[in-house]
Amino acid sequence: MPRRLANLTLLAAITTLLASGILAWLLPASAAGALYIVHRVAGVGLVLSLVWKYRVARRSLRRRGVGGSGVWVGLAAAGLTIVAAGLGLAWTVGLVSFDRPFAYSALNLHVIAGLALAGIVVAHVLMRGESRPALVTFAGRRAALRGLALLAASFVATAALDRIALARRDSGSRHAGSFTGNVFPVTIWSLDTVPNIAVESWRLRVSGSTSAAPVELAYSDLATLPRREASVVLDCTGGWWTEQRWSGFSLSDLLARCGMSEAATRVEVISVTGHRWTFDRSEAEQALLATHVGGEPLSAGHGYPLRLVAPSLRGFLWIKWVGEVIAA
């Protein structure tokens, strides 16, 4: 494969992986299914493309040596590509698990390496970018056949990997047990730590852009809201999933109680740690603010005294330790 065609193939694969990975995180599960397939196929295509890239890079290093910042940026990109792709494949075939001795699982590290790779690739393209030949040069019959062969091989290899992979959801997450109360993995978003919350002084603040004045509710006040229960799957981006019986009150009931439901089109839920997310009206109407799981009060690691349960959305959007809700 010509050098520039190999580079463009790698760039296309990495771009596809980043776009499909990020969008699949943000979209509801019902809309993300095709993106998971695209992500797996692009990942296999990336690994296959590395064979051609290795030949190109070896010739280039023999000719130019390792001097120059562009070469080192390229080597950094190669290293991150190997780490991200290696962790992804290891996860698929079950060589690594979501159980980990430190804060992030192998799947988390796969994501971190992929995001770091994006920045390195941009720098590499800017430093080594070439304007000639134009892309139309690669539209010939030979290039098209090579591209189709790579795509076909990627689909075949992906199907083969899926046959030997451990049981998992479309997202790649593995089962971590269900209906176990608080006995399921504890995952902390980003660099958050589990806060020490004194429930006696904790307050849930509800405010918005309506005429209603802000409201603060104590933990004991939550018992006056209509009680809701639901069995919902929590699919964590750390690579595991669990189905639990959550109980609490609906976000819609809370807003109605505080006089802020009619005009709200977006609802922002904020943790005492600062982690926050804004949900549209349809998502907010499905959400539950849970105080219990499996009949047990939430443990500190699982969000006590209050956490969001957001059906069909990934776990990093299930805000823990909720301290404020803003309707807009």
Feature roles, as predicted:
Residues 160-328:
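Structured, non-membrane catalytic/scaffold regions adjacent to prosthetic-group chemistry
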Residues 1-184, 193, 206:
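Membrane-embedded alpha-helical bundles that constitute the cytochrome b-like, heme-associated redox core
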